[in-house]
Amino acid sequence: MLWDAIDLKLLLPLVCAGVSFVLYWRVVKNEQLKRYFFSRLPFDKASVLHLVFSKLFGFIVLGLIPLMICTFLLPEFSFGICSSSSPLVNSFVWAGLLALVIVPLTFHFSQKPENLQYYPQLRIRKWTYSTVLIYLASWAVYLLGYELLFRGILLFPLVEALGIWPAIAVNTLLYSAVHLLNSPKESIGSIPFGIVLCLITIETEGIWAAYLSHVCLSWTNALTAIYHHPDIEFIGNKSRD
């Protein structure tokens, strides 16, 4: 036979991931789209709306659409959304344990100048409480789609097709490659983090520990970067001039 069920479990997630990431980056990095926002609104408002659009678009293109396609063609998988044998509380326990490591490490490295070159991704000078909440919420939504793709679609079918460690290797390689778009150091740092998230996802049979851990890392990085960035002023409840 030229084609069997294993081929679909291996190729469909990889094709979905490749197409979705190309589409995502072409849209969010499109200069005409940026001009649409920035030519109609003041810089700060345009920056916030463009970031919110980018994160919502990422959730849809990286997570929701691939999930719909893969659920239709691979109905035997739940892709880590639910588990019949592992209680959800296990995911919260693992996420809590990981947070004990993630928070201090991220707090330490997020203050460094090389990190502040990239974060926070919203490059406005004056931040209010609402700006911070919008920024954190946008990241939480985006990361749900991101984890649906990496720890759901790109893990469970590959484990069945390749075995646990080959699947983790492929998953982590792709995960690290995506982070090259930010910086080589971030790409290297994503390797152990990606392996740990894959192992916990397999252990808990769900994406939720990985998702909560990733949100914890993202929010810690964001809040630390906002606080330490020399070009950012936090003005609380005050309105921008």
Tell me the role of every PLM-derived stretch.
Residues A46-F57, S130, I134, L162-N171, ...:
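Membrane-interface starts of transmembrane alpha-helices
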Residues Y36-V48, T71-Y142, F156, E160, ...:
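Juxtamembrane helix-loop-helix connectors linking adjacent transmembrane helices
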Residues L64-L73, S138-V141, L199-S213:
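Hydrophobic alpha-helical transmembrane segments in multi-pass integral membrane proteins
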Residues M1-S85, A222-D241:
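N-terminal, membrane-interfacial amphipathic/helix-forming hydrophobic leader that caps
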Residues G58-L64, Y142-R151, F193:
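Core segments of transmembrane alpha-helices
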Residues L11, V15, L88-G96, V132-L136, ...:
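Hydrophobic alpha-helical transmembrane segments
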Residues K29, W165-V178, P184-D241:
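Functionally important transmembrane alpha-helices
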Residues P113-I124, G145-V170, L199-G206:
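Membrane-interface helix/loop boundary segments of multi-pass membrane proteins
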